[in-house]
Amino acid sequence: MASHLASIYGTEQDKVNCSFYYKIGACRHGERCSRKHVKPNFSQTILCPNMYKNPIHEPNGKKFTQRELAEQFDAFYEDMFCEFSKYGEVEQLVVCDNVGDHLVGNVYVRFKYEESAQNAIDDLNSRWYSQRPVYAELSPVTDFREACCRQHETSECQRGGLCNFMHAKKPSPQLLRDLVLAQRKYLALNAAEEMKKEPNSDSTNRWVSVTAERKN
């Protein structure tokens, strides 16, 4: 019985726990959902809900060219990536372009380590971004391939922005490459600096002991 429950946990067969919350980290029913939304105590992934404001959804009526929209999003994505990377190595950053209340503007960040995610949560909830308070929570999402709408990837989604799966908004490929490379170099530099600060104590002890033996 226990193994069966474990095998269906978070799936559509699970009548107790919400499969959408488990896969997406958000559910259109919110607190009114008939199934449980089990918030994780530990996770590599954090969610900052409603953080991205797409200019085309703003009520000011201003029109933008596609180039302007792309440049604005690249600036936002770079800002997010650089800031989140201060807490630890970022493996994936996903920004939702959905318009449904539970997904609109959601920013998901998966770190390499759970400790980095927790550090981010502890700090971000006392900060502001673009004149608005930041809200951050641990998310159960670990596999964005399951969370993202596959039809949207091929421009075939019939539900548009109201889809209940993530419509991930992509930065320019060059920007993403630059950010990943910059993070890799930064981590390598930090690792090299740490090695300089902390000499291998075991190696030092071995040399001392050998020297002592020779003297004897």
From Swiss-Prot:
Intrachain S-S bonds: none
GO biological process terms held by the UniProt record: mRNA 3'-splice site recognition; mRNA cis splicing, via spliceosome; mRNA splicing, via spliceosome
InterPro entries according to UniProt: Nucleotide-bd_a/b_plait_sf, RBD_domain_sf, RRM_dom, RRM_dom_euk, U2AF_small, Znf_CCCH
Protein's UniProt keywords contain Metal-binding: yes
Keyword tags: Metal-binding, mRNA processing, mRNA splicing, Nucleus, Repeat, RNA-binding, Zinc, Zinc-finger
Assembly information from the UniProt record: Forms a heterodimer with the U2AF large subunit. Can also form a homodimer. U2AF large subunit (U2AF59), U2AF small subunit (U2AF23) and SF1 (bpb1) interact to form a complex required for complex A formation. Interacts with cwf13.
Protein name listed in UniProt: Splicing factor U2AF 23 kDa subunit
